[in-house]
């Protein structure tokens, strides 16, 4: 089999988004909170031609609708108050600048602002992934697949993004993922998610072998039950073996039981397709699929509806607080 890292990508890193100063969270703790959230086709109000057709055709979509949606996203960010946000389905870097401008006036403490940001997507892609952080970001790399050994042509696949986050004096290696959807059939498209898993595991293995603190986050479009688990572990251990060689922990088993209900609601059924996967030298202090005003009364995600301008996303945000210390002696 052949695997190449190739393709043209846009990668953009912003440092000190707020003009009034650049600080990072300065406590000595190794504790850090992270949210990963698929924000559901988050386009801006400018038409570049790569947008999905329902946004291009819609008479309801424009500056006013975009600004209203942006405000709601920022309200969720303030409410969850995570140190790091990993977003899937962001159109471009300009949205990160708009987020920063929207948030900059709400905190007198610059250490509480998200002064660091990154955006990346393939040149031909409509949407990409973004990171906003209170901690400095560095050394971003984008990794694509070029598979030519399958019977069918490789579809458009989003890249894996690797970057480093300096959490006070401790380095966290963060991998951002948005894997192939099941559109076109779960079984038929599984081969491409397998390839993406192989790519991620090969990248993680290098950091794993040097004892780094590693966290993979994103929308994997694969339920936790569909991953391969450690054969010698208890069923509720939460130890997933990525690519058959990299053992990582899934907090969907936080507390020793499978967390309910899930993060994505489709065809009247909950799924757990959004994930954190962590090296085992990281301790999880909290984990949840966060609920709030971004949910319907029933608790399911309030998906964004372009024809009404209402809603948030068809996914729930996943929240975790982790300690970059496996015995949890360095976290408050």
Task: Identify the residue ranges that each predicted region occupies.
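Bacterial N-terminal signal peptides
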Residues: 11-21
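Catalytic metal-binding/acid-base residues of hydrolase active sites
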Residues: 40, 90-91, 178-180, 220-223
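Metal-dependent phosphoester-hydrolase catalytic domains
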Residues: 23, 155, 202-215, 221-332
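Second-shell loop/turn segments in exported
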Residues: 58-64, 81-89, 117-119, 149-151, ...
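Structured beta-strand-rich core segments of catalytic domains in phosphoester-bond hydrolases
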Residues: 90-171, 179
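Metal-dependent phosphoester/phosphodiester hydrolase catalytic core
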Residues: 167-197, 202, 207
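Beta-strand-turn-beta hairpins that frame and shape the catalytic cleft
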Residues: 28-34, 43, 155-181, 324-327
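N-terminal, active-site-proximal structural segment of metallo-dependent hydrolase catalytic domains
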Residues: 22-106, 121-122, 324-331
